[in-house]
Amino acid sequence: MVQGATYTKSSTFFCLFSPIADEVVLCLYDDGDCGKEKQTFPMIKGQGKDKDMFYFRAYGDLDGTYYAYKIIKDQKAVLSHDPYAKACGVNGNRSMVIDLKRTDPDGFENEVIPEFKSKTDMVITEVSVADVSSDESAHSRFPGKFKAFTEKHIMDYFVDMGVTHIQIMPSYDFASVDESSTRKQYNWGYDPYNYNVPEGSYSTDPYDGAVRIKEYKEMIQAIHKAGMGVIMDVVYNHTYDVYGSCFYKTSGNYFYRMNKEGYSDASACGNEIASEKPMVRQYIIDSLCYWVREYHIDGFRFDLMGVLDIETLNLARKELQKINPDIILYGEGWTGGESTLPEDKRAMKINACKMNGYGMFSDDIRDTVKGHVFYMDEPGFVNGADGKEDDI
């Protein structure tokens, strides 16, 4: 079964993986914030190999309708947004049914995507969406927003630098910024909440689930028109927290690695994702492929890639290359702490030979050349440190 909300003009098919639920109720809303539910439908529990799936087909044109799942276990109920949500309301707590065709900017479906055959010739710059245009010196009409990338002088800045690819720091929906607040806020965004939805604080209207999608696509289109590629920074190694996550609400601890003390924490963020489990693996692959198909992403930078397992990433590469044979894949080949996943299964630098098609950052070269990233009293080669020649 295809998970999430699959839209057609005549009906929408809802499907959720929930191995912990006794019952699941689909709740529909007119708004994505705090309005009362307008309809509820008990979902049908699957049988056999689909015994952990719940599904329901709602008839009528539901484009723009918000929804949530009521998970009932042991006669206790909790509301959750959809892990497979493609759109959502403000702060991501309610998912939204969306006709994605209406979010395409003019010409987006058939846009010309720049070709970059030689990955060794790439010149990549890392940016935060907020940092690009928030300062007054940027003279942007859309400070801190996706739409700032559609302004010619912003794109000219990157072109003049000689950049071939823009690596965008987390731009999916993250939990550390209140999208409903008008006060200035800032966060890098390594706090995943909705993996398949753009961040609302970077849109001009976080309350309308379609706006952030269209403006994200406009950003991608503008970068491509300027002759550059887009690399998306993705954080599949952990969630913002456990108990507020849709993974936990719908699936308990299934999505997380556990140890004797509780949650394994190789991310150093309080939890780590169990990428080796079948439904988690499928989720990560589905998510990556969705961003490439729907948003024309050219590549991915994996945060703490060493927390993820090798097999999942190799399978993801194969699926991604079916969509784009020149897909760009690289990441941090280390963890932020000890993991319950055996080291020989981790996507780390030491296992790079098992991961064809992936590049890895080298913190060793970085520290050797410029000095230790954390300790000022450990200089590097360019600062005159002795004994670095062999390392170089």
Q: Where on the chain are the PLM-derived regions?
A:
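Structural beta-strand segments of beta-rich domains
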Residues: 10-14
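Conserved alpha/beta catalytic core and glycan-binding cleft of carbohydrate-active enzymes
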Residues: 91, 95-102, 317-392
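Core domains of carbohydrate- and sulfate-ester-processing enzymes
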Residues: 65-116, 176-191, 226, 244-262, ...
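Beta-strand signatures of extracellular beta-sandwich domains
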Residues: 25-27
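Short proline/glycine-enriched turn/loop motifs at strand-loop junctions of beta-rich domains
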Residues: 17-23
